[in-house]
Amino acid sequence: ETLKCYADLLCRYKINEWQLYIEHTYLFRNLSEAWRGDTPLTAEEIMELDRYCRARHIELIPSLSSFGHMYRILSTKTCCDLCELPDSEKIPFSYTYAGDHHTLNVSNPRAVDFIKSLITEYRALFTSKKFNICCDETFDLGKGRSKALADEKGEHALYMAHVVELCRWLLAQDVTPMFWGDIMWRHPEAYAEIPEGVICLNWGYLPEQRENEVRDLAQMGATQYVCPGVCTWNRWLPLTENSYKNNRAMCGHGRKYHAIGLLNTDWGDYGHICHPWFSVPGILYGAAFAWNAD
């Protein structure tokens, strides 16, 4: 019911796409180790929400971590061998450790097929023809089990191989892949390897967010969304003025460099201690600037 209330809010302010970011909070088959003790969304709940959103002209887009930010899944006995850092599942939980050190080991032959199986199971619940594979903040890549391969081929080559493989696989199914652009900022020239038809989600959350990242990827031919934030995460109260300035700046960059959309973000890094409804002002700023970018 809470998610339906959000859908009503988005509809009221002409927000026509919505992504629910998932790491482990869906009831995946054969992954009860990851969601046990939590309250994961079920297939029935997601399909009901998808229908509810479509009735309000909102496209509900699946968003699933498929490279970095896989703490709960890669900490299970079943999947810990797929984690970049050996024995990371034995380290006591902390929000910082969970967020920074659970990257998929792409040198493992099982890794890509495992991710494809999760995407296949999850994507079937949505009517959207888009899929956000995320692939952001792969902090550990090349530093553990894949170090030998990274030393041979280069860390960025490992990153690109995984992203390109998933993108081509989705495109072959007539699905538009989306991914976060933070790793590409460091190597914008490598964007030529990304297949045509992929959407890059270019984020930046500062009040006076610079245009460089949006400009550089635009010059490389990227099709992109600009992605500001509501500035509520990791705090008790929202930074409302920061969100206003951030949304204004990112919308300006998007208009200047011909972005095709805006995705406003509300994260739960270090625990979402801020009340969810405190995000509403930032959500509305994004809607206002997106529809009135000039």
Region spans (language model):
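Glycine-rich, histidine-containing beta strand-loop boundary motifs that form or position
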Residues: 19-24, 62-66, 135, 181, ...
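Substrate-binding groove of N-acetylhexosamine-processing glycoside hydrolases
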Residues: 48-51, 57, 109-131, 137, ...
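Aromatic- and acidic-residue-enriched carbohydrate-binding clefts of CAZyme catalytic domains
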Residues: 11-12, 19-59, 69-113, 124, ...
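Generic hydrophobic, helix-prone segments enriched in Leu/Val/Ile
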Residues: 5, 21, 82, 284-287
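N-terminal structural segment of carbohydrate-active enzymes
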Residues: 1-19
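Sparse, context-dependent recognition of short Cys/His-centered cofactor- or disulfide-binding micro-motifs
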Residues: 3, 26, 31, 64, ...
